[in-house]
Amino acid sequence: MAERSFYDLSIHYVPDGKNTAEELISMAKHLGFAGIGLSNHSTAEGPLKSDGTEGFDIFRTVELVASNPSKLHGLVGKYRNKVDVLAVHGGDEGINRAAVENSNVDILIHPFTPKGSGLNHVLAKSASENNVAIAFDIDSLIMSRGGRRVHSLSHFRDYLALSRKYDVPMLLTSNALSIFGLRAPREIIALAALFGMEKDEAIMALSETPLKIVQKKRHDKNYVCEGVEIFEPSPSVLGDE
């Protein structure tokens, strides 16, 4: 796997997490990542880190937390041009739906609700159409025990089946809150097998998918905010001078 470049796009630093950006970067480099996304929740906004180090990429990630779809749309407009990766913290049916229906959202993370996995065929189809990746956060497996771990595995199997059926981008992430939550790419790929992800799928979810996310031309000069975009009139509209 040496020829692959691996990226973890959801690593929380202070104030969300317990470690500084510098400490997390150092550990991630040691574990073999080519780059990471430094994240905070929108409710715990800290300084957005984006300075890379030689041979290592650092991306600005925000995990939006909203109480309703209307507030989520407002947060998307606020943060889209400020970050490299825009994730939505799900867990509510309305928020999950609003996230996957919005092409300005990159990732839906923690979609499971008290009633179930939080995803269905309709939402998976919308995620595919709008190129919104579904995150499989490995901390749900390594940081939980008993019934909670069983539920996480069950939800991940549901996400996997829906993602395969509707060609939804799949993303693997540690969702680490400290250096102790980080895992090497090889370990994450191995853990993904617990819920049925094939090795080639896991490699893509940790390499090609995150790279495609950060390479999106989200900061287009014509993008103003959610629901507002500038269009240049064509010559036929302007008419002949």
From Swiss-Prot:
Record-level GO BP terms: tRNA 5'-leader removal
An MF annotation (GO) of this entry: RNA binding
Lineage: Archaea, Methanobacteriati, Methanobacteriota, Stenosarchaea group, Methanomicrobia
Assembly: Consists of a catalytic RNA component and at least 4-5 protein subunits.
Protein role: Part of ribonuclease P, a protein complex that generates mature tRNA molecules by cleaving their 5'-ends.
Alphabetically ordered keywords of this record: Cytoplasm, Endonuclease, Hydrolase, Nuclease, tRNA processing
Localization terms from the record: Cytoplasm
SUPFAM superfamilies: PHP domain-like
Protein name: Ribonuclease P protein component 3
Annotated GO CC locations: cytoplasm; ribonuclease P complex
InterPro entries, sorted: Pol/histidinol_Pase-like, RNase_P_comp-3_arc, RNase_P_p30
Documented EC number(s): 3.1.26.5
Native organism: Methanococcoides burtonii (strain DSM 6242 / NBRC 107633 / OCM 468 / ACE-M)
Reactions catalysed, as given in the entry: Endonucleolytic cleavage of RNA, removing 5'-extranucleotides from tRNA precursor
Family assignment from sequence similarity: Belongs to the eukaryotic/archaeal RNase P protein component 3 family.
Keyword Hydrolase included in the entry's annotation: yes
